[in-house]
Amino acid sequence: MNLTPIINALRKRCPTFERRFAGAAEWAGLTIEHAPAMPAAYVVPLREDASENESQNCYYQTITNTFGVIVLVSNAADVRGQGATATLDSLKPELFRALLLWHQEPKDEYSEIVYEGGSLLDMDDARLASQLEFSFETYLDLSDTYQQVELDGLPEFEGMDVDVDQIEPSATGRPDGRPEAHFKVEFK
């Protein structure tokens, strides 16, 4: 899942964070000793859930992409975390306005982003980390399959030869294996 457009949108639409949005690598590399300016947030992929193939004679599958926005706020002045949770609650509306019901481009390939919930990840005497979870759907269709690769490799359908074998209802009730007619169809 490509989260770069989401990070860019958050940087543009959330002025309180002063563009302090980064990705999974920066979150993974964050240490206790490293104290980024806060508030800061990290956008990380969480999971992809696939539905069953929704077509009986083609291919259409919905993929639910879930990502987290891990928000870091300062907890230095309040070891009980009440100030940090109040700060977090004041930042949520800004994040929601930046993401909820937004369609990434191209719009026909992405559903709108929805909120899935949140949880506290960590809290120490310096900072509080809370993860807000969001999701959007993408879609797989025939163009994403190997069958399409095979179909693309076939020559153009130019015509067909047809043999007609009449059913003999009085004798066997089946075709006798000897064609009674033949015709050719050409497409030009």
Show where each model-derived region lies:
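Short amphipathic alpha-helical patches
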Residues: 33-40, 118-123
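A solvent-exposed acidic/polar surface segment
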Residues: 34, 42, 90-94
